[in-house]
């Protein structure tokens, strides 16, 4: 197409939401009328599936659960009053708690106020709050925020070293209450408080399902906030998981919810051209041929949105990365997601995007307003923001000229309302795409398999230590494996004892480290 034809296609396929001032441009995805015609039946089913989901149908058949994260911003849509109360009551509880924290009515022992927040959680319990904090936290928030989102001891130490624990409020988030990484982080943090003779329960709150292990453990903490059974971790940002830390930072959570609600309403339209999430799903389906054959590269041209790609990585990949479809057929679905920010990425991997393997499609996120206040001219007639805009437009054009396709999302500025809308836009797109390819977007059997494998390694470690202690002499790896009845697990045993030796715990190894078969394992 020449430039005038492209301009006409842009106008033909431009979506604009007047209340949100959000634009979605899929004109650089080269689908045609025949392609659209072939998807009509699939999209009609997708629209019906979404309507049924919102009405309370079992959308997660593996776990026999409803999927209700869309109700979080529209409680009136929940199927019954009990569910509506499960949404509205925690929001009221959050607002009251935050008011008391900010005023000092709830304060740490022997201090005037809390000054910092430490969020302990992993996956959806961290990625959403981290994204929102980076995008929306004010320059001088009422409380500064930090995160422990891994079970890495050195990382935990580094985070704790930068916090005034005496005035730090700890939020421990775990839906089940038994996630090892969140539990480990909580125990490490509690230990740090106790070493300083600080009363950990008077600094801690929990976000978890009622009746969970964490809920029971946290009964003497400042308070507990509920997570709902029908909200998954990766779609929990607009539940207490994300709203509590956001509100504590002074972010307007009502505006976040309002933006998401506006977007949800727009995506209930059974008209492809007028439904932005359906348009996104269409573009994804076209680019990957319905099989995830191309990666999704997220390029927000705004520093405050640089964590959006990490947030979307979990939302998209954990939802769509499935071995089997709903009929039990092996399909190996999924879309790989990565990205950082523009224009930084133009000095990193855009070279490959332009001239390397064409195994991706890009999503540019444009923010129209450069900053609060005026900008200086860095060249005659041009500001730094003009350069950023020019680099986005230039990169989009350069990619298109080499048959690299792209989507562009444009918002006026980064506000709570816009962030809520972006979250909803992608949540709904994931749901539509999942319907198009007939998969369950709301379970994660691969994650559970990884957890079980990790548990088996820890069980093997306990057996290793016990056998070496009971034997009383040094053992080589093969003999040790045989003694614990795991002759086929020599490699795993080797890696376990190597780790224990490096941390000077329980066991020691001697011998030629370059030749594992020569190593002798004994008690330390």
From Swiss-Prot:
Function: Catalyzes the reversible isomerization of glucose-6-phosphate to fructose-6-phosphate.
E.C. number: 5.3.1.9
Pathway annotation: Carbohydrate biosynthesis; gluconeogenesis; Carbohydrate degradation; glycolysis; D-glyceraldehyde 3-phosphate and glycerone phosphate from D-glucose: step 2/4
Catalyzed reaction equations: alpha-D-glucose 6-phosphate = beta-D-fructose 6-phosphate
GO cellular component terms, A-Z: cytosol
4Fe-4S among keywords: no
Active-site residues from the entry: 318, 347, 451
CDD domains for this protein: SIS_PGI_1, SIS_PGI_2
InterPro entries: G6P_Isomerase (IPR001672), Phosphoglucose_isomerase_CS (IPR018189), SIS_dom_sf (IPR046348), SIS_PGI_1 (IPR035476), SIS_PGI_2 (IPR035482)
Name of the featured protein: Glucose-6-phosphate isomerase
Keyword Cytoplasm: yes
């Amino acid at each position: 197409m020449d430039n005038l034809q492209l301009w006409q296609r842009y106008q033909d396929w431009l979506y604009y939401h007047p209340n949100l001032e959000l634009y979605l441009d899929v004109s650089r995805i080269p689908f045609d009328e025949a392609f659209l015609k072939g998807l009509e039946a699939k999209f009609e089913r997708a629209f019906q599936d979404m309507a049924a989901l919102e009405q309370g149908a079992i959308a997660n058949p593996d776990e026999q659960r409803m999927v209700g994260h869309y109700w979080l911003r529209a409680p009136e849509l929940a199927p019954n009053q009990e569910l509506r109360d499960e949404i509205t009551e925690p929001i009221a509880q959050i607002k009251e708690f935050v008011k008391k924290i900010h005023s000092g009515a709830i304060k740490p022992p022997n201090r005037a106020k809390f000054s910092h927040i430490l969020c302990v959680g992993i996956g959806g319990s961290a990625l959403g709050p981290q994204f929102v904090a980076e995008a929306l936290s004010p320059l001088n928030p009422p409380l500064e925020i930090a995160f422990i989102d891994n079970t890495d001891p050195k990382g935990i130490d580094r985070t704790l070293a930068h916090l005034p624990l005496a005035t730090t409020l700890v939020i421990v988030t775990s839906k089940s209450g038994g996630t090892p990484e969140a539990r480990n982080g909580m125990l490490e943090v509690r230990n740090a408080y106790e070493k300083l003779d600080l009363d950990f329960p008077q600094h801690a709150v929990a976000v978890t399902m009622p009746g969970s292990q964490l809920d029971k453990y946290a009964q003497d903490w400042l308070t507990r906030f509920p997570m709902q059974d029908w909200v998954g971790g990766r779609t929990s940002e607009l539940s207490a998981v994300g709203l509590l830390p956001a509100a504590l930072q002074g972010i307007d959570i009502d505006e976040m919810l309002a933006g998401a609600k506006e977007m949800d309403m727009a995506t209930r339209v059974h008209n492809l051209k007028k439904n932005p999430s359906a348009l996104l799903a269409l573009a994804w389906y076209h680019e990957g041929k319905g099989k995830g054959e191309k990666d999704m590269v997220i390029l927000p041209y705004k520093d405050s949105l640089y964590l959006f790609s990490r947030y979307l990585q979990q939302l998209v990949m954990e939802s769509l990365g499935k071995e089997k479809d709903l009929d039990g057929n092996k399909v190996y679905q999924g879309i790989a997601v990565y990205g950082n920010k523009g224009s930084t990425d133009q000095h990193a991997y855009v070279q490959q995007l332009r001239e390397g393997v064409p195994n991706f499609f890009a999503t540019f996120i444009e923010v129209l307003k450069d900053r609060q206040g005026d900008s200086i001219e860095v060249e005659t007639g041009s500001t730094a923001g003009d350069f950023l805009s020019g680099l986005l437009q230039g990169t989009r054009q350069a990619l298109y000229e080499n048959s690299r396709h792209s989507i562009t999302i444009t918002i006026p500025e980064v506000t709570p309302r816009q962030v809520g809308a972006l979250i909803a836009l992608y949540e709904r797109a994931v749901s539509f795409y999942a319907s198009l390819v007939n998969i369950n977007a709301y379970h994660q059997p691969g994650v559970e398999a990884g957890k079980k494998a990790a548990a088996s390694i820890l069980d093997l470690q306990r057996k290793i230590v016990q056998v070496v202690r009971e034997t009383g002499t040094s053992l080589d790896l093969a003999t040790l494996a045989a003694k614990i009845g795991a002759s086929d697990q020599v490699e795993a045993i080797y890696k376990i004892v190597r780790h224990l030796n490096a941390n000077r715990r329980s066991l020691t190894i001697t011998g030629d480290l370059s030749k594992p078969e020569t190593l002798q394992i004994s008690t330390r």
